[in-house]
């Protein structure tokens, strides 16, 4: 074990050569080298999740077998049950984050053999981190001579590693590490150890700049209206020198400062970029999907439209200077932060070539812009929306609505959206929702009252539509593929905040119920964290169902194909086996219920030459397979299912693919429930097997 310092450790398991054995076969010769690798989180800097490989296709997908697998349990002092990573593959080596310590591992991409591992022991700083566990990925850089791997630790330190050995690059930062809580144009409070700021997504490397965003606690109960700010920075890839910073909450004399009334920009925080960033290196432009400001559901302490909250912002790659922006939600109140990477797409609209950027959203809207100018490709209309009545709140009277493409998932709730398998269940559902305020997208939260309404019932908010895995794009057909949760219904009620919980006037809750801190699923789960409490009160979450059945009618989860040349939906299918609770419901015996899809939000898609590939987010037990989940393949032209293979647990990280030694592999992260994290690589049987 080679020691970097008291914090970092790298171990070279086997000496690595500059290139592993390469077999020149007919299968590998037909692809360009860049098409056989996966060098970025989203396959490329455009965020396409696309590779034109077709060795695995409709005729053989169901024949896939496990080539190798690696559990992440030992990359930390406890297992993790939320493995969300998508690996990289460059020069026959697969790189991934793993385990509750967020270690970096390098594997032989063909065999899964461990080549090296690097981990950071961050002590109290890692234990207090707002985004823990293994995170979602890494970044790779090479100038043709040197090769480096970049990642951000739970404690918010940017690490540069030698890609061949896993050793820290001494010339970067201080001994290979850059403290991201410093040189951030703010003083992180209350201190550098416990100050709330971090990130779980992969950094992005474009040309010689590494770009890092910021994230905060996942829970829906802010302790204060004040928080650290989520600025975005670019650093020199060789030295770690800060090259630029973009203030997602503008400072005085900066554009957008006047959208924060009563000096609220001075103390409001969050407003980071916690998901993936995309880059057009040719244009020298970076696309930043910005989250909500402090307090997802109550904005009375931050009156105004609150730029650049919930905005897509384009900045210069060299300077970080804002080129254009579009705010998708004015004065955010619904946790509709832009949760996934913008997709860069070269399309043809009305005979004219357009360099576009397409932004999937939780609302199920796909916003499409000219990525050079920021002009919408199709009109986006400002429409009047309901204005609420929560004391002290500030409301925007209008919100932006795209005219094309149409919404690809439900947003807003009406009686027509309720479960409709039979009249009895529909009546029970109507009784449940009678206690809530219903309305279309952008219906505001309400002050919760025990005698009603308890809250506003929403679809297309925190867990709706497309979440962090994002969409995929086929650059040959100009079609976007997006998974969406079509039934992730969430009530938003507000109650006065107890002083011991928060200094906000209102926080998420239900009148008459105990109110407490609502924690995110990864909090206090990292290797340096104390064990989490067994039970914590959560006043804002109420599970809504009817006889344990989903309150909303199917389809629960969908994959949609959207033609970007025309702004039209090509096809939409239910994705995921019908849940056991539905299939085994006594009153449904003998009924022919079409596949419903699944009520989950964290599914990413992989696009190949002919297929759309996605796993399920829930486990089921059927006559066809034991308890587990299924990795499914669809004909990307029609949406017809053409193959399926078994997974022992739900897909929890987006799948990726590559070609090594003439063989195509698909790697997917699985975890959840009692099943700890595991990367599984699938490939076709070798000839003669």
Please place each PLM-identified region on the residue numbering.
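Bacterial N-terminal signal peptides
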Residues: 13-25
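N-terminal pre-domain segments of enzymes
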Residues: 29-55, 396-430, 521-527
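Repeat-blade elements of multi-bladed beta-propeller folds
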Residues: 38-42, 80-99, 103, 129-157, ...
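N-terminal cofactor/phosphate-binding cores enriched in small/glycine residues
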Residues: 47-144, 149-174, 178-181
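A structural motif specific to WD40 beta-propellers
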Residues: 67, 113-117, 167-170, 179, ...
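Extracytoplasmic beta-rich repeat domains
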Residues: 70-86, 117-144, 174-202, 218, ...
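Beta-propeller blade signature
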Residues: 161, 166, 228-241, 305-321, ...
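Phosphate/diphosphate-binding loops
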Residues: 341-390, 671, 681-686
């Amino acid at each position: 074990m080679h020691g970097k310092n008291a914090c970092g450790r790298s171990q070279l398991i086997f000496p690595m050569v500059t290139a592993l054995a390469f077999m020149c076969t007919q299968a590998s010769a037909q692809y360009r080298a860049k098409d056989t690798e996966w060098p970025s989180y989203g396959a490329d800097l455009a965020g396409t999740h696309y590779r034109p490989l077709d060795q695995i296709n409709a005729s053989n997908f169901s024949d896939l077998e496990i080539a190798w697998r690696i559990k992440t349990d030992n990359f930390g002092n406890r297992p993790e049950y939320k493995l969300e990573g998508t690996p990289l593959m460059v020069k026959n080596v697969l790189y991934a984050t793993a385990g509750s310590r967020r270690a970096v591992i390098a594997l032989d991409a063909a065999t899964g053999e461990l080549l090296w591992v690097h981990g950071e022991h961050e002590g109290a700083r890692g234990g207090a981190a707002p985004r823990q566990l293994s995170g979602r990925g890494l970044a790779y850089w090479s100038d043709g001579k040197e090769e480096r791997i970049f990642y951000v630790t739970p404690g918010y330190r940017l690490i540069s590693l030698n890609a061949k050995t896993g050793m820290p690059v001494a010339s970067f930062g201080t001994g290979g590490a850059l403290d991201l809580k410093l040189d951030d144009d703010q003083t992180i409070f209350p201190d550098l150890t416990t100050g709330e700021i971090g990130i779980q997504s992969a950094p992005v490397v474009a040309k010689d700049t590494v770009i890092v965003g910021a994230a905060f606690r996942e829970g829906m109960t802010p302790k204060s209206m004040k928080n650290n700010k989520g600025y975005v920075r670019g650093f020199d890839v060789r030295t770690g020198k800060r090259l630029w910073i973009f203030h997602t909450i503008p400072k005085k004399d900066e554009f957008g400062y006047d959208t924060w009334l009563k000096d609220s920009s001075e103390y409001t925080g969050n407003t980071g970029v916690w998901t993936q960033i995309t880059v057009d290196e040719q244009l020298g432009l970076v696309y930043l999907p910005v989250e909500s400001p402090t307090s997802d559901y109550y904005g009375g302490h931050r009156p105004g439209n609150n730029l650049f909250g919930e905005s897509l912002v384009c900045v210069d790659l060299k300077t970080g200077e804002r080129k254009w922006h579009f705010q998708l939600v004015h004065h955010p109140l619904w946790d509709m932060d832009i949760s996934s990477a913008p997709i860069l797409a070269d399309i043809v609209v009305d005979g004219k070539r357009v360099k576009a950027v397409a932004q999937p959203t939780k609302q199920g809207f796909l916003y499409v812009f000219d990525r050079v100018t920021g002009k919408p490709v199709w009109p986006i209309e400002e429409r009047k929306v309901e204005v609420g009545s929560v004391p002290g709140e500030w409301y925007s009277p209008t919100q932006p609505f795209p005219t094309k493409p149409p919404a690809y998932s439900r947003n807003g709730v009406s009686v027509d959206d309720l479960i409709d398998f039979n009249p009895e269940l529909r009546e029970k559902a109507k009784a449940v929702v009678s206690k809530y305020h219903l309305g279309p997208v952008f219906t505001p939260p309400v002050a919760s009252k025990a005698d009603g309404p308890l809250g506003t019932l929403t679809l297309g908010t925190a867990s709706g539509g497309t979440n962090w895995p994002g969409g995929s794009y086929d650059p040959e057909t100009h079609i976007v593929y997006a998974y969406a949760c079509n039934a992730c219904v969430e009530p938003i009620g507000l109650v006065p905040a107890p002083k011991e919980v928060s200094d906000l006037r209102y926080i998420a809750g239900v009148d008459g119920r105990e109110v407490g801190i609502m924690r995110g699923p990864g909090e206090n789960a990292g290797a340096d964290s104390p064990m989490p409490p067994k039970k914590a009160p959560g006043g804002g979450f109420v599970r809504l169902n009817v006889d344990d059945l989903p309150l909303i009618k199917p389809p629960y989860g969908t994959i949609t194909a959207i033609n970007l040349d025309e702004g039209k939906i090509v096809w939409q299918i239910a994705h995921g086996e019908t849940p056991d609770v539905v299939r085994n419901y006594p009153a449904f015996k003998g009924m022919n219920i079409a596949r419903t899809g699944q009520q989950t939000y964290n599914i990413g898609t992989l696009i190949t030459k002919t297929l759309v590939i996605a796993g399920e987010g829930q486990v089921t037990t059927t006559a066809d397979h034991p308890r587990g989940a299924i990795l499914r393949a669809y004909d990307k032209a029609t949406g017809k299912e053409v193959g399926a293979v078994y997974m022992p647990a739900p897909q929890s990280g987006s799948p990726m693919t590559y070609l090594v030694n003439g063989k195509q592999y698909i790697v997917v992260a699985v975890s959840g429930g009692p099943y700890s994290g595991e990367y599984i690589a699938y490939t076709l049987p070798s000839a003669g097997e």
